[in-house]
Structure formats: structure tokens, C-alpha cells
Amino acid sequence: KEGTDLYGIEAAYTADTYGVAVAYTSLDNGTSAETTYWGVNGFYDFDLASISVGVETEETSGTDKSGYFVGVTFPEVGPGSVSVGLGTQANYADADPEYLTYEASYSYPINDGMTVTPGVYIKEAATGDDDTGVIVKTSFSF
């Protein structure tokens, strides 16, 4: 019986105001179905905001799927920063419906070692009953 083989490679470049990364993965699960993934993402920092984008493709036995995300952060909104983003929930085929997830958050530094980030998200659903959630993340640095 053949086992599962997984190979991957990633290359990235980062400068002061921008960065880009490319990733490739090949998954052979021991059957005739081999899956390959390609991903490209990057960011650019403007004076007033930074933007991040990414795209991923997946090919399994002739079926192509893709997904993407985009996010924007405004670093100087009051004492904290505001982030908004949207992206596909997973890779989807061209003929499939595209369900998105939207998110927004505000990161507020309490002191030099603690940051609180409240946020909200909306996740579209095929049934029309979208999921909505609220989160609060607390980060500590020592």
C-alpha cells in the first residue's frame, strides 16, 4: 500500500514597506488523485494604510479551485488601529457559489505589554442563515 507524500516550498521577500511570498505544495495520497496548491500573497504599506492581498489555487484530478483575501489596516485611528478584510471561506470551483467572510477589528494598546482587539465577523452561508460573531483578543508581550 502506498503512503501519503507531501512536498512543499515557499519563497518570500520582505522590505521596509512591502513584501511578497509564493508557495507551492504537492500532495500525493497514494491513489490516482494528486493535489497541487499554489499561493501568492503580499502586502504594501502606504503612508495612511497598509493593504494585504492573497490568492490560492488548488488542482485535484482536473478540478480547479481558487480562493482569495484582501485586507486593509489603518494604523493611526485614535490610539489604535482599524482593520477590515474579506475573503473566500475556502477554495471554490468556478461553477460553485462563492461564500465570503467579512471582518472588522480595532486594536487598542492598553500599555507597552498588552493590547486588546475587539472584532466582528460575518460568514455567509448557503442556507441564507449567515453566521455573525464577536471576538475579543488580548495579546501580551514580555
Model features per residue range: what roles?
Residues 103, 107-109:
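CBM-like carbohydrate-recognition segments
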